[in-house]
From Swiss-Prot:
Residues 372-422 are annotated as: Disordered. It comes from Xenopus tropicalis. It is found in: Nucleus. Pfam families: zf-C2H2. GO terms for cellular component: nucleus. This is Transcription factor Sp9. Signal peptide: none annotated. A zinc finger (C2H2-type) spans 295-319, 325-349, 355-377. The gene is sp9. Residues 413-422 have a biased composition (Basic and acidic residues). Transcription factor which plays a key role in limb development. Positively regulates FGF8 expression in the apical ectodermal ridge (AER) and contributes to limb outgrowth in embryos. The keyword Glycoprotein does not apply. A motif (9aaTAD) lies at residues 163-171. Belongs to the Sp1 C2H2-type zinc-finger protein family.
Amino acid sequence: MATSILGEEPRFGTTPLAMLAATCNKIGNTSPLSSLPESSAFAKGGFHPWKRSSSSCSLGSSLGGFAVATSRASGALTGGTATANSAFCLASTSPTSSAFSSDYSGLFSSASGVSPQESAGQSAFISKVHASAEGLYPRVGMAHPYESWYKSGFHSDVSGGASAWWDVHAAGPSTWLEVQNTQGALHSGAAAHGQLGAYSPDFSSLTHSAFSSTGASHLLPGGQHLLTQDAFKPVLPSYPDSGGPMLSGAAGTGAGGTGRSARRYSGRATCDCPNCQEAERLGPAGASLRRKGLHSCHIPGCGKVYGKTSHLKAHLRWHTGERPFVCNWLFCGKRFTRSDELQRHLRTHTGEKRFACPVCNKRFMRSDHLSKHIKTHNGGGGGGKKGSDSDTDASNLETPRSESPELIMEGVRPGKDSGNDS
């Protein structure tokens, strides 16, 4: 047997790789008595990585790491007639040998001089051993931290293992964002980009930055993926679709409504006074009420009528006691119901006297004071009307008083609230 062994290839019994393989084989052996002949015979035979063994390696109970080991035939231990051959196998080693597993892991894929048939057989054998080894540890998703690197030649799936949060490459098809679906995500991103581009060009940079990051989004766990196409659906409504009917409806209203009443009363009533509510209730039959343009006070016992809704609102403030107009003169701060009352009050601060007597050229701040003065010249003649006209000219045109003859209904006493001075 020694002659046949010496006649073969050069010996590698003294190399560190052979010593490591012998140690691994010694630990993997079940009989402690056969370890010494095995190591001595292996030292004589050498380590031949290009030959294949006829027996497989036994798998121990502790799997600290994987190393390259050699297996001897059982006949070489007793008879000594069979030649010693070596092959690749995965043997269980001590935890200290796991440091050498990554160094010699390249021999799985870069062994020189291996025929296609032998390489196919070796890969099938290794995949079977690896599947049985992973079955012992169903709780661990990966047998080694760098398993995805040195297992480039074959792939095995752990059926009972739960993938950890860092196990990105082993994610199943149940995850909603995968690396393989990058093209689909980019396609959906382009569709959303087209929809947003039709609305406004300001969203183009947003969609580009959001969907261009999907290539790197697989590095995040499943709970951290926040930018999806569904997230944009409830946020951005379809403005172009709803904008078309709105514009067309507005154009149709402008073209169809020729009269002022058609534009004004096309929707709800613009005023809540009794006259407007009655016209709204009658519909087309209330066109006569709309043409009059009269807005009456709804307070019982008042019955005043105004030609503009703004005038009616100013009158209603007198009922409610609201005083929105404030004097901004220093240390004054008085509040008034109407703007003309505020203007008349400001003349008391400035000392302006707008109304002059046509007889004696005496000037007055208020028109009613001028009216009383003219009565002294005429002996109580028709000076009152002149003072009333002057007061009307002095008042603000935005909120005219209700003493206008054409807006007063019968039975309403004129000048009811005209003589109050604030």
